Amino acid sequence: MDCIDKSIRRESLRKLGCLPDHGWNLFVQSSNRYSKLLEADSKLFKAQRIEDTVLSICEVTLENKASENALTLFQQLRFYLLNYLFLEDTSEYKSVLCSLDESVYPNLLPLTANICPCILKALLALVRQHRELSSDIVKFLNSIFLALTRILNTPHSSNNNPTHTKTTIFEKVFYASHLGFFFEEIADACISALPQDACLWAMEVCNTILVSDLPCKLIDLHNDSFLHHSNYYAGFGLSYYLYLSSMKAYINSSGCLWYEDATSFWDIVKHRPSSPEEKPFLTQFQSILNLSDKFLSKTGTLRLQEKLGTSCNLFFVLVLKLALLSSSYIGFVPYTYSDWINVLLGSISEDPELLPHLIELMASLACVFPTHFQFAMKRLRLIAIYAPRFDDGNVTYAQLASRKLAQLFNYSSRDTAITSIYQFANLLSPADTPDSYLAAPKERLSISDNMSSSSSQTATVNTISNYLNVIDSVREIALTVNDEKIYGLAISLLIQKFSRKFDSRVSTELVRTLADISTKANDRDFSILVQFYSIQNKMLVKNGDEALTIAICDSRCLIARGTESNSFKRSDLLKSLLEEIIHIGIVRDTPAPELKGYYFGMSKAVQALVECVAGTDWSSLPKEEMYPALFRDMWFTLVINRFRYSVDLGETLEVDLENIAKNSPLLVFEDFGSNFESNLELNTVLRTHIEHSVISQIKSELLVRVPNIDLKPLSTSEICFLSAVLLLESLRCKSNKLSALVEYLLDPSLRDSQLPQSIRAIALYNLTSFVESLSKERRVASSTIDEFQKLLCLCCNRVDCVRQLALECMNYIMETLPHLLGIKEILFSVLELSSLLWKARTEECTDQYVPQLLYKSNKLNLSVILSDIYSCREEVLFQFNRHARSWIQNSSKAIPYQVKNLLESYLADFVDFDDLEVVELGRSLAVELGTRIVSSDRDNFVLPAFGNWTPDTSSEFMAEYTIRQRYSHVDNSILNIEGDMSTDRIDLILNEKSKLFETHLAALKSLEDDILQGNTVSPQRLRNEVRKAAAHAVQEPIFQFSVLARKIVRIPFLDFSPSSFKLGITLWNWMMNQVPSFSSFLISNIIRNWKNEIVTEKRGYFSTAKSKSPLALPMTYSPTERASFLSYKNKVMSQMIPHLLLLQLIAGNFEGFWYGDRQTAKLIVHFMKFVLKKITSMEVNLNVLTRELHFKFVSFGLRIAENLLNSPLGSRFYNLCVDAGLCWFSGMPNWTYGADKLHVAAEISVMRSLRDKLDSFLLRYPLKVSTTLKQKLLIILLNNEMYMLYTWLTPVLHGRNVRMVEPIPDSDAASSPITLEMLQVAWNVSPNIVLYAPKRFQNAPLKQMALNFVIANPFTSVKHEVALEYLFEHYPSGEFPIDRKFILYWEPMYPVSGPVMFMPNVKWNPQLLQYTMRSMESYPVSVTFFYVPQIVQSLRYDSMGYAESFILETSGTSQLFAHQILWNMKANLYKDEAATVPDSIKPILDRVMDKMINSLSGEDKQFYEREFTFFNEVTSISGKLKPFIRKSKPEKKAKIDEEMKKIKLDVGVYLPSNPDGVIVGIDRKSGKPLQSHAKAPFMATFKIRKEKLVDADPEELAVNGTEEEAGDSAKKQTYEVWQSAIFKVGDDCRQDVLTLQLIAMFKNIFNSVGLDVYLFPYRVTATNPGCGVIDVLPNCISRDMLGREAVNGLYDYFRTKFGDEDSIAFQKARSNFVQSMAAYSVITYLLQFKDRHNGNIMIDDQGHILHIDFGFIFDIAPGGITFESAPFKLTTEMIAVMGGSNKSQPFQWFQELCVKAFLACRPYAHYICQAVEVMLDSGLPCFKGQLTITHCLERFALNLNERQASTFMLHLIEQSYANKRTLMYDQFQKATNGIPY
């Protein structure tokens, strides 16, 4: 072991001692072994092994050990200390040093001087750590001290033997030295807290030495032959050393006794020292003061100086510190302290080491005794100026003094610090100037009047040294005071004082000082400093001063390192450096002989830039500063100024340029501009004069390095650009970064230029050097792996040329370096990207119209942005998949085993239960290619193909993968019971199994509790715990298995999520395979839990909550929120999928149980019977999203029935299945929800399979007539449902459709086979089947049959609202051929239908009116609130007062409803806008309004008065503005602002158009007059506080429809928005109100089917005749305004605002445009919007198109001229945005969405018309009587089936496509009103 390095051996022992338990025991054994060796032979103490052991014990002691361990360490340290001091372990500790041979003396002291201090340090550490050992250790140390002093006090022997004399002298030197070490360690130990008894002991021993004359007795021992020059001697004599060390220990132990550590008294930053109120140690400190007075007396001073023969100034300074400490404790300071300080200050030239102590002394003196504050401040200031300096690089005395000075400023005003800064800065003037203060004689600046005459002699001051001191002082004061204003002042003054006349050392120090202060300064001062540096460096280019240039460079590097990346300061410095380099390069007019300074200055700026760009994130820098443009110009500057890659001068900076290149942005960006060539030509750098020789040289360099590049067609600017790209990217390639070159082609303007081929050539040139550099590396760095991942992502880029270049590069790399796919991250990236591309491609089938553009991998840091064009995605997938296969196959030939292992690892690392994706291309690719890798057994390949099968290695690959999987998930619970099976071994195994069983059971119980309590359970935890328990359960006997299995089955039901059920079903299947005998137990538990879930929890399909019609939900005036219905879909699907998975599990195992375990099979049969009865009794939620599950239940029931048909149970079970199938059709025919084509295809597939099975049953089995009729009807209904869904799946047959299902023939839409007998049996199953059958088929006889059933069975029909609809359709007068009493109990009609019941065509019928009132009252106010206009119009026909009663009652419950009613009534009082022609309804409205107002009282009345007063104040501004109509806009604006200031804002008031918010603020400067010839409309902005639901249950909202009923889980969050509103006077807004009301209804309808269209029904409220409030659409601009801004067209606007067509922003905006365009187009046709000029069409900041101003709808057009004959506006510019032609994918989306929107709203056509019908007599000009309703219904094409309706809508699109009449109207508007198009 002696051969082991001593440091390694010592560190090993130390680490062993720091280990617990066994490691500590080994350490103790080793220590004891060496101590025994030392006892046996004392000569061994010199061995290095013993020394290492002792030092390791000391180091272990410094760790905080347990008490028993500390005692062992103390014993060891005690033993070794006695041995190294050569003291006998007796009571007197006698020395045995004299017994040693004299020859060992020279080497003895160095050895002990190294070890003994370490032992003392360790012992004192034990005193600090273990108070229980403190007294014993202190007692031992005191004994050592007494022994040493006794030996040193022993007089010299009179023996004249020289050998004996020499030995005696050595002994005294030895022990005197160690006594000094003793005090040194005490002083160091007191820096940290020591116990009081230890401190008191230390003070006692120090006092003993200082009081005695022991040090003076050792004066004669100055024998250099014995003295070891240790750092402990510090260059002093042994006697003086003892004085100094004991005094230092005295000071520290006294400070520790007072403050618990020795430094606190002198650290005036932490606290201000002061005399304590309680003085428990007064005696001790009084004795200290007496001792110090003795030393400081004139007698004591002279005596000590005479004995030691030196001035002893350092000792007296320490005595003075001790005296100050004691007097501070006592609270009295003698005046002699200041005298002593002055005396000592006079000696600093002789003893400069006094200064640190004097500085510390004066600072504490000033703090403790304020009378000495100015005295200390003055002297500290002078020290800061005149203190000597040394070139050792340490902190200067001036810095120490100024630092303490600054700390004292904390105890005075900040003005003191400012004054001092000014005083110091004013001393900075060059020596040759008149105001050079520091060049004056020193007597002007004498430190004290008491200084000796020698110090006052005239002498020339070292001006440079003093300047440097002043600069240091300014820096220290600024940094220590830590005040923003002080920083700014220091920077400002130092910049002002900067002069080139200073010595270079002063200038450079000033520059560096500014850098130290800068990072703490505010941004403004920092910017000033940065500009100062830049200006100076630019000046130095011509007037070279290399030292100053280097200082500026170093300073800027320091600033860059001291600021955070992307902070303002770093960014400011970065900008300054870039601008400086560019400026130097552009304005250079330096003569050739002076080029050296120019290049030197630029190179130093480049070096500073290196530090500045490190870690910079360009995306977060402020875009307005144009950092990429500055970098681009900087590289251009370097290129044209010979800093090129091939020039020697550039190579001198190659490392710096490489670091800049590594973090430099590309020279082009996507927002670079529309024309690349023109941008280059206009570039600031490139348009300067460039010498022809430079251009020629650049060309030749490019051609030499990139031979394939063609420079002939390129301009000078383009050539310089390519040279800059070559320089930048060649340097970047040295850092293994290649992808940047490919990214250049992402810039659209560059792609349109002549440069792409040149960029490609440069990329291929750099590719070879990149590969060569990479091949030389032994290990691929993580940054290089990141680069490969980036390059792989570019191989999937949406831009073709980018993708092709990236693939070309990757192909070359993979061919040259195939081993790269042996790196896990790279191979996994290839596979992950394949999966991402596949997922992106399949999105056409899952979320077609709003495709996800950004795809990220959860496993790796990968992301790709793809086009929204699916054909492009398909091309990307095809190319990448083809190349990926090639890369992996090529690598598998070079490194087959690595690739195979990695492929297996990829498959093994798959997180299988977090994602329900069933197809992952990456995994499939791994399996496919892994099975093709050459086998290790090559003999297999010589076998012929037997049985038409060629041998391959797939079995080997899968075997290896299986083994890997088996052993990678081995659970610790699987115990090895093989081998020794003795009794003890068996007992051990059983005991361990029992413990594991309890552990897993407890873990499962904890999971259960957490789920039941609603605590968050991570999927990882659930997966791990359940897996481990399942692995253990299959090894247990039946009892333990059953206990664990119950938990394993129950937990997924408690969690009830798709991922938990996928996990559970996988484990249940595995457990049944592992232990087949327990299968029935598991299935029975699954069924029991499932049945309990259905009965108690009722989630998903078995929920009792029924989704409401969109007409029964609140209508909102807000934009479409796609997130809300996506959230609803996800919630429903998450609760439906578990049932689907469970059904698949049960159905998949049924056949096996039927033939193997009939009892379990019967259990399944009984469960299915239970489920089917639930369905037939309508105890399920027939949501459109549950269609697949519903018919899968029925299909599985038929499978069971087929096995039971031969039994009595079979016929009944089969009949139950058919009834369950029919029950799906007991509701309104519904489309699907969302754009998931896969889901629709799955539904069609399930229904087709069910239909085929029913057809088979008809042919194979004789059934009852009733069953056969029901079965035939079910087949007809299934055909119709499939036809309807197929139409939805393929709305545009001629377009791009993914073939997912077989086409459904048109014949399936017919209803001719339905007979009365079928309807009769169906009625017995559920009347709704019959009642909703006419809704599915365009068949009048079928509707008549349904009506007959209603008339014949009114009692049964009252539960179904649709039955009343048929009655009204055939008997519109309301005279039904049934008993009127049934009407009272009928299911409530929709609120939109209520007001229609009061119209004259419905004859007076009290029962019908009572039913109407009950229906209206059954809905919450939030629903009826929407129909205020219709409710008010119903008063026109309310002869019995029912409508009036409803208004009054509802107004009493909702003040907001009452206010809206009042405003609407006021708006309907007159027929004209001027309020001159009363409406016939006016008396009724007046009466009702009076009743409503008179009924108000209390808070309701106050609220009414506040609201209407406030609103009247706002609207009155229009009246006051009328005299200003013909005046200028500024005058109008001033008047509005004047009136706005007068408005009083009361609590709770709101805008009529925003009743769901409260006004909390008014922008009183926001008033804006609007254009009008004779009216005075204006716009104003208000701050509105609203509430929104947070974490609301989306399913509950869809069911209940109101926020009030959204459940307890919903939380309301308050938020504020600024809303602008237009206040109109003289314009009838009622028609806009109606139109936007209808648009809101359409929005609800579209949302009900999850249709990806967009509408924004903004709010308009009519408040008086010709008056109203209109909400302003936020963030919108009219197409008219775009035209006035000289925008060529919408497409150009989209490109300008959102970027190139390939950009993500453009594609998102285009998608938004398509969605909104489709919705508004359909509504425009249905409601006949006219006057659609560009002033009435808006574009918002997200690309949506919006319509406003609905003055011409239904049957009227502007001026009666029918210019706009097209169904809707679809101009060429709109088509251009949507792809440019009717063949493009976005336009096909538009077509499909139009068709789907049309299909979705057709079932609600009558209700939409009812909302209009009740308004016919309102006097609105858009109506032509009942003809309006007739025409409106005709536009819905209700006589057509679904496919015919889709064709009809496509024909309308074709008619509108670039219609000439639309263009003519736009031209007409431009000619007449100046509206551009």
UniProtKB/Swiss-Prot annotation:
Annotated localization: Cytoplasm
Top-level taxon of the source organism: Eukaryota
Alphabetized UniProt keyword annotations: ATP-binding, Cytoplasm, Kinase, Nucleotide-binding, Transferase
Enzyme Commission numbers on file: 2.7.1.67
Name of protein: Phosphatidylinositol 4-kinase stt4
Coiled-coil stretches: none
Gene3D superfamilies the UniProt entry points to: Phosphatidylinositol 3-/4-kinase, catalytic domain, Phosphatidylinositol 3-kinase Catalytic Subunit, Chain A, domain 4, Phosphatidylinositol 3-kinase, accessory domain (PIK)
Region (Pleckstrin homology (PH) domain conferring phosphoinositide binding specificity): 1492-1625
Keyword Cytoplasm annotated: yes
Any single Gene Ontology cellular-component annotation: cytoplasm
Region (Activation loop) location: 1747-1771
Chain spans, region Catalytic loop: 1728-1736
GO molecular function: 1-phosphatidylinositol 4-kinase activity; ATP binding
Family: Belongs to the PI3/PI4-kinase family. Type III PI4K subfamily.
InterPro entries (alphabetical): ARM-type_fold (IPR016024), Kinase-like_dom_sf (IPR011009), PI3/4_kinase_cat_dom (IPR000403), PI3/4_kinase_cat_sf (IPR036940), PI3/4_kinase_CS (IPR018936), PI3K_accessory_dom (IPR001263), PI3K_accessory_sf (IPR042236), PI4K_N (IPR045495)
Database matches in CDD domains: PI4Ka (cd00871), PI4Kc_III_alpha (cd05167)
GO biological process, one term: phosphatidylinositol 4-phosphate biosynthetic process
EC category: transferase
Residues covered by the PI3K/PI4K catalytic domain: 1593-1861
Predominant location category: cytoplasm
Region (G-loop): 1599-1605
Primary role: Acts on phosphatidylinositol (PI) in the first committed step in the production of the second messenger inositol 1,4,5,-trisphosphate.
UniProt domain PIK helical: residue ranges: 1305-1491
